């Protein structure tokens, strides 16, 4: 490996140390309903985002809360010497993409059938540390 390539790889590795992510695949909720909850926590600090999700009455908020806790644990595993409160973690990015669709048929009048689409989604949460983000800018 060349010197330049090694330097860029090390720089990328250091940049990735300040972020952590978690993924939830094939969650049996429609993407539209999940995006309503995801928009509430996008850009929020982690503590505030957890409170928003805990006190939300939507079913999607329970799944997002578990995913956010998983992302926090991933960050703690990456940064064993770092302190969670001092790092100032926030929800840097949250993506809700459409997942697999189960297609079912429901009988309709006059011998026809209507297609029922049971939608699912994929959610990705990326956490970033405020201290590192501001020092790099």
Curated annotation (Swiss-Prot):
Q: What does this protein do?
A: This protein binds specifically to 23S rRNA; its binding is stimulated by other ribosomal proteins, e.g. L4, L17, and L20. It is important during the early stages of 50S assembly. It makes multiple contacts with different domains of the 23S rRNA in the assembled 50S subunit and ribosome. The globular domain of the protein is located near the polypeptide exit tunnel on the outside of the subunit, while an extended beta-hairpin is found that lines the wall of the exit tunnel in the center of the 70S ribosome.
Family indicated by similarity: Belongs to the universal ribosomal protein uL22 family.
Gene Ontology CC terms, in alphabetical order:
cytosolic large ribosomal subunit
Here the disulfide bonds are none
Query: What quaternary structure, including any partners, is listed in this protein's UniProt entry?
Result: Part of the 50S ribosomal subunit.
Source species of the chain: Flavobacterium johnsoniae (strain ATCC 17061 / DSM 2064 / JCM 8514 / BCRC 14874 / CCUG 350202 / NBRC 14942 / NCIMB 11054 / UW101) (Cytophaga johnsonae)
Molecular function per GO: rRNA binding; structural constituent of ribosome
Record's PANTHER family? CHLOROPLAST 50S RIBOSOMAL PROTEIN L22-RELATED (PTHR13501), LARGE RIBOSOMAL SUBUNIT PROTEIN UL22M (PTHR13501:SF8)
Q: Does the keyword rRNA-binding apply?
A: yes
Protein origin, superkingdom: Bacteria
Q: Which InterPro entries match?
A: Ribosomal_uL22, Ribosomal_uL22_bac/chlpt-type, Ribosomal_uL22_bac/org-type, Ribosomal_uL22_sf
- Whether Repressor counts among this entry's keywords is no
| Protein's UniProt name | Large ribosomal subunit protein uL22
Q: Which UniProt keywords apply?
A: Ribonucleoprotein, Ribosomal protein, RNA-binding, rRNA-binding
């Amino acid at each position: 490996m060349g010197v330049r390539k090694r330097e860029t790889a090390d720089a990328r590795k250091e940049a990735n140390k300040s972020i952590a992510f978690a993924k939830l695949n094939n969650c049996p909720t429609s993407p539209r309903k999940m995006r309503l909850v995801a928009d509430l926590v996008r850009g929020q600090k982690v503590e505030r985002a957890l409170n928003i999700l805990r006190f939300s009455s939507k079913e999607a908020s329970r799944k997002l809360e578990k995913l956010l806790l998983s992302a926090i644990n991933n960050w703690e595993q990456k940064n064993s010497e770092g302190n969670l409160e001092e790092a100032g973690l926030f929800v840097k990015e949250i993506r809700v993409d459409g997942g697999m669709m189960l297609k079912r048929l429901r009988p309709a009048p006059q011998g026809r059938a209507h297609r029922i689409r049971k939608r699912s989604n994929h959610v990705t949460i990326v956490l970033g540390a405020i201290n590192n983000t501001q020092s790099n800018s």
